Amino acid sequence: MFSFAPVLVLLVIGNSEAGPYARDSVDRLQDIGLANLESHLARLPRASGCSLETAIKRKEWSSLAVEERLDYINATKRLANKPPRYSMDEVPGTRSRYDDFVATHIQQTLSIHFTAKFLSWHRYYVFAYEQALRDECGYRGYQPYEHWPYYSSDPLNSPVFNGNDSSMSGDGAKVAHDGIPFGNITIPPANGGGCLLGGPFKDFEAHLGPVASRLKDVPPNPRKDGLGYNPRCLRRDINPESSKFTSETYTYDLITKNKDIHSFQTSMQGDMQRSNPGVHGGGHTTIGGDPGGDFFNSPADPAFWLHHAMINRT
């Protein structure tokens, strides 16, 4: 549980020059944006200590040292072992501080997607999660992001999803399941769909939901609102057909071809009429499974936070 109190934070998304991937056209757009921001700040009186030099700097996952990735992974697990702030009367299924964030998203889903609040709400949401990791779990860094274009052609072999000890875990076991309909298209299933096969989150549990699972065999929640206790494994179907919608071209065009916030948010979130899931929907369906593929319950998969940190960056 967290409060949307007013907060002013100057955030700089760090580039990934030290990572193994060549910087692309989207990275170069960031360079232009930072130069414009620096010019803008230079014209303003320094009423506070905020500057590019003092700003929070978030890093791309592949540019983090292994020790930094492990620090983030361990902080996430510590948050999942801390007691919740929601009471059992408010959210009967919550069992951890991590679940607090999931419950908040479930309860507000319908007012924070496909509305004007989408970007601002999720920006603060990721910030609040980042602060919880730092203030409550001893995390020394800031929320990392995944630069989708680096991995869009082969997400399963990316440092995010390759399943090694410094990844966010990888795919789930092979389980037959349906594709993902979106407008006039259906994204075919990939080769997962079951419980995680390995990696640091293999034994991580989802406790809430499902509310709108795309998988038909997920045990139902005892409550209609999805807030009852329903412990189960994390399931994924890492899908390269979905990740095509997060490619360099899709991301670059999203930023450069939408001239107002309405068209930008609409294109980003997904346009059902044009059968385009957008980078937002494409990123979520790349993770897929349960809870990652559940519109309401997706934050219950820790990969959510890297995806939405990139939404913030974009």
Regions found by a protein language model. Name each.
Residues 1-24:
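Fungal secretory targeting signals
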Residues 19-314:
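C-terminal accessory segments of proteins
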